[in-house]
UniProtKB/Swiss-Prot annotation:
It is found in: Secreted. It comes from the Bacteria. Keywords: Carbohydrate metabolism, Glycosyltransferase, Secreted, Transferase. Disruption phenotype: Mutant loses extracellular levansucrase activity and loses the ability to form the typical levan-containing, domed colony type on solid medium. Produces normal amounts of amylovoran. Disruption of the gene causes delayed development of necrotic virulence symptoms. It comes from Erwinia amylovora (Fire blight bacteria). The active site is at D46, E287. The gene is lsc. This is Levansucrase. Sucrose binds at W45, D46, A132, R202, D203. It catalyses: [6)-beta-D-fructofuranosyl-(2->](n) alpha-D-glucopyranoside + sucrose = [6)-beta-D-fructofuranosyl-(2->](n+1) alpha-D-glucopyranoside + D-glucose. It is an enzyme of class 2 (transferase). SUPFAM superfamilies: Arabinanase/levansucrase/invertase.
Length: 415
């Protein structure tokens, strides 16, 4: 389709050494153990607000809509009971990924979400797992393209089209009956399952670049090559101080933020392009990448875990970001290190899967909050929304809001 000549920006080990856990300007407030839950029937985690190709969060006829990864809470299933017959919520929560389904919720207020049900009926998806992506409102007729990840067998970026229908009382979805596969990892630019059984290839986030009018997509990947074959050169190291040259097993970390371009705005045919960001020797996961376009800059956000950092590096679960004046870079790590918003060390697993919206609001879900010493409370529900301020290559957390507060930025009246 097109020729692109750019080199990925390297997130270096020297950059990651600058991560400062518990910096008050980049740390999410502590969540109270008495948090409310959206539903006693289902867990939710990755949250995908309905948006347009510019990234603006959309309501339809006054209804806010979010999509979530969802799994039933199996409170009465013997498989998730302990030896005394009590419900083991931890076992149920940790099992959720294998039975993930995409569901939707709606609200008049941007909170107090009402459960709408599954987006795709049972049997529509070609794989056993429905993993995260992006719902895009295409027009004022209510057409939606849900870009998502088909997982097990394999991992394929796909989309499915449907329509939103509203009344004064509720929101329903129609269609979503034919899944179209778009592309998978190629083994040349992006690592495949054959190269690494622990490979990552998921989380499509399409957008139209205002500078050239083309449709692109971010996604999570790993740099191609057999697992453990990546070399940590001086370029990946960066300017590390004396005593920090030991990389341990960092050759196993090869995360990247991938890019693809569509043949046209229909989004039916795609060309895989080189990554925008690589994290070889730094981190193995760069999940749910997405853009915020502000002040003529490209703010690229991704989420990652403490446990996926390479040896002799660390950082909290949370949001990491990079900024550039051009789509293809080069990118500068936000706040020198990349860390934009992390969990406090006192509650390292309280939230995850953050999504930064163009209005600065950041949504996430509650994973687990410490309770009574070594015990903890499982969430599976929306976390409090926070707000960050972006100023050049720096960010600051400036406000916090109610649980699951995801207001629309623009309302579309259907014709």
């Amino acid at each position: 389709m097109s020729d692109y000549n750019y080199k990925p920006t390297l997130w270096t080990r020297a950059d990651a050494l600058k991560v400062h856990e518990d910096d008050p300007t980049t740390t999410q407030p502590v969540i109270d153990i008495a948090f409310p839950v959206m539903s006693e029937e289902v867990f939710i985690w990755d949250t995908m607000p309905l948006r347009d190709f510019d990234g603006e969060i959309i309501s339809v006829n006054g209804w806010c809509i979010i999509f979530t990864l969802t799994a039933d809470r199996n409170t009465d299933n013997p498989q998730f009971q302990d030896e005394n017959g009590n419900y083991d919520i931890t076992r149920d929560w940790e099992d959720r990924h294998g039975r993930a389904r995409i569901c939707y919720w709606y609200s008049r207020t941007g909170k107090d979400w009402i459960f709408g049900g599954r987006v795709m009926a049972e049997g529509v998806a070609p794989t056993t797992r429905e993993w995260a992506g992006t719902p895009i409102l295409l027009n004022d007729r209510g057409d939606i393209d849900l870009y998502y990840t088909c997982v097990t067998p394999g991992a394929t970026i796909a989309k499915v089209r449907g329509k939103i229908v509203t009344s004064d009382q509720s929101v329903s979805l129609e269609g979503f009956q034919q899944v179209t596969s778009l592309f998978s990892a190629d083994g040349t630019i992006y690592q495949t399952e054959e190269q690494n059984a622990f490979w990552n290839f998921r989380d499509p986030s399409p957008f139209i670049d205002r500078n050239d009018g083309k449709l692109y997509m971010l996604f999570e990947g790993n740099v191609a090559g057999p697992r453990g074959s990546h070399e940590i050169t001086q370029a990946e190291m960066g300017n590390v101080p004396p005593g920090y040259e030991d990389v341990g097993g960092a050759k196993y970390q090869a995360g990247c933020v991938g890019l693809a371009v569509a043949k046209d705005l229909s989004g039916s045919e795609w060309q895989i392009l080189p990554p925008l960001i690589t994290a070889v020797g730094v981190n193995d996961q760069t999940e749910r990448p997405h853009f915020v376009f502000q002040d003529g800059k490209y703010y690229l956000f991704t989420i990652s875990h403490k446990y996926t950092f390479a040896d002799n590096l660390t950082g909290p679960d949370g949001v990491y970001g990079f900024v550039s004046d051009k789509l293809t870079g080069p990118y500068t790590p936000m706040n020198s290190s990349g860390l934009v918003l992390g969990n406090p060390s006192s509650q390292p697993f309280q939230t995850y899967s953050h999504y930064v919206m163009p209005n600065g609001l950041v949504t996430s879900f509650i994973d687990s909050v410490p309770w009574k010493g070594k015990d903890y409370r499982i969430g599976g529900t929306e976390a409090p929304t926070v707000k960050i301020l972006l100023k050049g290559d720096r960010s600051f957390i400036v406000d916090s809001f109610d649980y699951g507060y995801i207001p629309a930025m623009k309302d579309i009246t259907l014709k």
